[in-house]
Amino acid sequence: MAKFDAHLKCSFCGKSQDQVRKLIAGPGVYICDECIDLCTEILDEELVDSQGNPRHSSESNRKSATASHKSGKPAPTLATIPKPQEIKNFLDKQVVGQEAAKKVLSVAVYNHYKRLAWQGDGQGETDLSATRLHKSNILLIGPTGCGKTLLAQTLAELLDVPFAVADATTLTEAGYVGEDVENILLRLLQKADMDVEHAQRGIIYVDEIDKIARKSENPSITRDVSGEGVQQALLKMLEGTVANVPPQGGRKHPYQDCIQIDTSQILFICGGAFIGLEDVVQRRLGRNAIGFMPSDGRGRSRANRDLKASQVLHHLEADDLVRYGLIPEFIGRIPVSAVLEPLDSQALESILTEPRDALVKQFSTLLSMDNVQLEFESDAVEAIAQEAHRRKTGARALRGIIEELMLDLMYDLPSKKNVKKFTVTRTMVDEHTGGKVLPLPANDERSHKESA
């Protein structure tokens, strides 16, 4: 046996057992004490960075990542937070109409960031008897193209905080194909240049939130991984928790380094069209009618039937959202709601010309780069707004109409050196929206129009 032991060698350096102090055996391999010392030195060198500071393990990395991403921007204070009236005035410059929704948003956002400033002063943490302030997330209900995303984006611009938009339709419950809910936080972190402290004061807008409603009012015995399952996964994030976010996105795994983000200071604004919600409200209003009122056979009284959809939604209650498919726990974490009105043709006209980034101003700026002055007649603006209203896609239809209308013009004008001014008339809009090809006027015709 001793003879056999004399032939044992280190699998790394090849020294025999007699040449080293200790030889440690493994499953079919051996390593000596000298090789162990060498490996320790190599690891020590790897764990020291270029500045001579020791590096940390993966668990410490998660903590140090949070600590190292200190925000270069100061935290909000009570003196720097804009007042509700100031917030609404800023929204008025960018968003046309929606007065009630602006008022609700202004107060909710002011209270949220006032709460952050109060916690930042330490008043809410040192005094155990002090009242603890909880955040109130916001639910925006309105048809497509009415300004839900623009309102949230404008708020983030005013407050100078990171802003991220997430699509609820791509989210699935953990363990299924699709995006985890933590990927929403990753988008916000990327907008903040991976600055955790700055990201924790940001705003996340979750669009198409109505698409994750469960398919029936009664709880299903089968798994709804993209509906009720997503609502369950979002509960803690909306309420406030420390979430582990993978820096590279995708699914999490146990051995992955994660960045920890506290969501208790992040304002979540959820928006959706909620098509058919007005019918749910009208059915409830019809059932609550007192006396023998004429009915249309669908549980709605004649008086309630004559209400517009937007007017009906002003009578919205939490029970209506439950019947629509949102679970009560989810609704309870979004206590503030605002209903946005559908845009009429008059509002669409204002959107074309009044806001800072109005479409007429955008296209005028584009053509001014080619030394061409672009003008829209008031009748032309009215015709564009009427066509957009007919298409039933809100303000999004305006850009599509103008892009189609200006295609030939923007194709030819850069090559025309003698054209200095162009006026869009109602006749041109009517010809285009009627399906006819809009020819670009000849040089003589343009010159004649300009001189007239």
Curated annotation (Swiss-Prot):
This is ATP-dependent Clp protease ATP-binding subunit ClpX. The lineage of its organism: Bacteria, Bacillati, Cyanobacteriota, Cyanophyceae, Synechococcales. Component of the ClpX-ClpP complex. Forms a hexameric ring that, in the presence of ATP, binds to fourteen ClpP subunits assembled into a disk-like structure with a central cavity, resembling the structure of eukaryotic proteasomes. NCBIfam families: clpX, PRK05342.1. InterPro entries: AAA+_ATPase (IPR003593), ATP-dep_Clp_protease_ClpX (IPR050052), ATPase_AAA_core (IPR003959), Clp_ATPase_C (IPR019489), Clp_protease_ATP-bd_su_ClpX (IPR004487), ClpX_bact (IPR046425), P-loop_NTPase (IPR027417), Znf_CppX_C4 (IPR010603). Zn(2+) binds at residues 10, 13, 32, 35. The gene is clpX. It comes from Prochlorococcus marinus (strain MIT 9303). Residues 1-51 form the ClpX-type ZB domain. Belongs to the ClpX chaperone family.
